[in-house]
Design a protein with these regions (language model features):
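C-terminal regulatory/interaction regions
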Residues: 236-309
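Short Pro/Gly-enriched beta-strand edge/turn motifs at strand-loop
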Residues: 7-13, 109-113, 134-136
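Aromatic/hydrophobic pocket-lining residues that form the small-molecule binding cavity
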Residues: 74, 188-189, 286
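Divalent metal-coordination and catalytic microenvironments
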Residues: 28, 38, 68, 80, ...
Length: 309
């Protein structure tokens, strides 16, 4: 973890750049209160709490906001709610009922084979609304594509965008609806068009460093999107490898046999194999995905053990 300091940010805003297992967290402070945007993955919940406590220097955290409810963005919610009993939590409206009833299927945690402790919410982050955090007005914009219920946050006075997983410097997040066979590439394109219209000068992505060069990031994202739209199998293989790599990031090291036992029980991986497995059995197809990760340097395989790399 490191604080993103390569780009100048307004006072009152702190970015905790986390990596790829946990999404970045953004802390906004002013005289009225302290707001945190996104809370990372459950494995890092103690670190998330420690970072927030250190930055707040004894003042309470008043509000927790989630851009969307993938496990790497809200896995620290429960720990923060436990430590700060008066904390309010706002989520985008699309999955409010799923959170109320804690449906791990609807929330994607079972389909992805990931973990997220149950949390509650007090309010909804409605697209079209504006909120004042960190002495800045933040507009909430719907940003479907990567996740149908995701939002992005834009402060027009400073031309500052929290883009979540709709835009990174090197692309964008897996288009999860497509993994389920739901067309969503057009929504990704529309969200990229929205970001272009907002024309931010500084972008705080869900993963990776804060950056300022919007045009090349959009060009790269659109190029990747075109490739995926023209060849959905390419996106499916990418999505499968992301799911496998994410779990390797979580575990660090695991036997290939145990990893295979986990992978064969992951619904998304089974669905992708059924649609794009080219007639191979599931174990063979998963071995192919692991071999591609190994060739790219994302995993090391030795003596029956998998090591995250």
């Amino acid at each position: 973890m490191n604080l993103s300091e390569s780009c100048s940010l307004p006072s009152g805003i702190t970015v905790f750049e986390r990596g790829w297992l946990s999404a970045n967290n953004v802390l906004l402070q002013d005289a009225e209160g302290a707001t945190l945007v996104d809370s990372g993955y459950v494995k890092h919940q103690a670190q998330t709490l420690a970072l927030v406590q250190h930055a707040l220097q004894g003042r309470p955290l008043d509000l927790l906001v989630n851009t969307h409810l993938h496990s790497d963005h809200c896995g620290g919610n429960q720990a923060l709610q436990t430590h700060y009993p008066d904390l309010h939590t706002w989520i985008p409206p699309g999955l409010a009922q799923a959170v109320q009833h804690w449906s791990e299927d609807a929330l994607s945690y079972k389909p992805t084979g990931q973990n997220c402790p149950a949390f509650h919410f007090n309010g909804l982050l409605q697209p079209g609304s504006t909120h004042r955090w960190g002495d800045m007005d933040w507009q909430v914009h719907a940003a479907p594509g990567h996740d149908p219920h995701s939002v992005i946050l834009f402060a027009p006075e400073h031309r500052l965008l929290m883009s979540a997983d709709a835009l990174w410097q090197n692309g964008f997040g897996v288009v999860f609806p497509e993994l389920e066979g739901v067309d969503a590439f057009d929504e990704v394109a529309q969200t990229l068009d929205l970001i272009e219209r907002l024309n931010p000068a500084t972008i705080i992505p869900g993963h990776g460093a804060v950056f300022t060069e919007l045009a090349p990031a959009l060009a790269l994202a659109r190029s990747k999107l075109e490739g995926f739209a023209q060849n959905p199998e390419r996106h499916a293989r990418y999505g499968a490898k992301v799911l496998l790599k994410f779990k390797l990031l979580e575990w660090g090291q695991i036997s290939k046999a145990d990893f295979g036992d986990w992978a064969t029980r992951v619904p998304y991986l089974n669905q992708l194999h059924q649609r794009f497995g080219q007639g191979l059995d599931l174990d063979t197809w998963l071995d192919m995905m692991l071999a591609e990760l190994e060739r790219s340097g994302a995993v090391q395989v030795e003596d029956g053990m998998l090591q995250d790399a």
